Amino acid sequence: MRILLCTVGVLLIAATPVCANQAESDVAMVKLANRSGCMTCHSVLPLPRRADGLPPVAPAWRDVALKYRDDAGASERLTRTVMTGSNPKVRHWAGRTGAIRMPPNAEAVGEADARVLVNWILVLVP
């Protein structure tokens, strides 16, 4: 029992910097998303329908992570979508979000930052 408790204690101590670093990374990513205007339409977690009965404007990032978790090309494709905007004729989120296309964000966020944000979003769900 003593060995088990010591092992668990060592593992918890070893994991603490990782958790702290992850929390710092999460805070940094949300700050970057706010500065870039992403949080105007998106949220990290799913939101309920609005008071007027309409769905949220854009998909929650957790839902994006779920949708694309097995897609090897998702990072590149979603980074391109962030930079150039979404195609208004393709309704990826029909019925779950508003019918507004995502505008190009190349002026609001650089491609390197967009890629970092997209990669962070894609690992929100293991």
Model-derived features: positions:
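Sec/Tat signal peptide C-region and signal peptidase I cleavage site
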Residues: T16-Q22
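Sequence/structural segment immediately N-terminal to covalent heme-attachment motifs in c-type
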Residues: E24-V44
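Axial heme c-ligation environment in periplasmic c-type cytochrome domains
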Residues: T40, P46-P55, P59-Y68, M83-D113
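Positively charged n-region of N-terminal signal peptides that target proteins for export
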Residues: M1-L4
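Short, solvent-exposed mixed-charge patches
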Residues: V125-P126
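Hydrophobic "lid"/C-terminal helical patch
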Residues: V82, L117, I121
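Post-signal/leader-peptide non-cytosolic segments of secretory proteins
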Residues: D71, R80-T81
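Bacterial N-terminal signal peptides
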Residues: C6-A14
